[in-house]
Regions:
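Charged catalytic cores and adjacent phosphate/nucleic-acid-binding surfaces used
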Residues: 1-51, 62-208
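Core AdoMet radical
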Residues: 15, 56-57
């Protein structure tokens, strides 16, 4: 993945596997997290100046907490917090669940905020304004997931995010080297919403 991203002209790659709760997706228990960190450290020496960032897509549990202890979460370069389970929620429950995760000091990015899958799942209802406002207050980035079956956050909310000063990260959600190119769909959706380069968190060299 790192070599494929480098060959496409990218300066860095964020490795963000599923977390330990996502056993259906081979999520990483703590011992495998630490093994991966060691592998990334070694690869960063070999691939410099290309950089691999240590990340995790940490599950937002039903109470809004993340599924690793603080001492593990603080070891990542960035943490993407996402909902993957118990999706049948009303707007108040879903919104409060996300708000709790946003306020977690380890959360860097709120991943695919509604959990929708286009053409197959509508996603849970959320109060987008409250979510975006909370991201502004906590300096949390919102993901625009570029998988063509997600495109979540919806482009219609990009102007409000920009108005509130919330950065948007266009992420390809790549599970293989071929998935890296899905970032193009996110770029198209972002342009439809009027996202500027300065408001796109990963449009420039990342400094963490």
């Amino acid at each position: 993945m790192a070599e494929a991203a480098r060959d496409k002209g990218f300066e860095y790659l964020v490795i963000s596997d599923h977390s330990k709760t996502a056993v259906y997706a081979d999520g990483l228990p703590v011992d495998r997290v630490k093994e991966q960190w060691a592998e990334i450290d070694a690869l960063n020496k070999d691939l410099a100046p290309f950089r691999i960032y240590k990340s995790i897509e940490s599950d937002i549990l039903s109470d809004g907490s993340l599924d690793y202890d603080d001492d593990i979460l603080e070891g990542f370069d960035l943490v993407i917090a996402s909902v993957h389970s118990n999706l049948n929620m009303d707007e108040e429950k879903a919104t409060e669940r996300l708000l709790t995760a946003i306020r977690n000091p380890h959360t860097t990015i709120l991943g695919h905020p509604t959990g929708r899958l286009l053409l197959s799942r509508a996603g849970y209802p959320i109060d987008h304004k409250r979510i975006i406002d909370a991201c502004a207050e906590s300096n949390v980035v919102i993901e625009l997931n570029a998988n063509p079956y997600r495109l979540d956050i919806d482009w219609k909310w990009i102007p409000y995010a920009m108005e509130k000063g919330v950065q948007v990260s266009i992420n390809p959600d790549a599970h293989s080297t071929g998935g890296i190119d899905d970032i193009q769909y996110g770029v198209l959706a972002a342009r439809k919403g009027g996202l500027t380069a300065s408001a796109c968190w990963n449009a420039n060299t990342m400094v963490l």
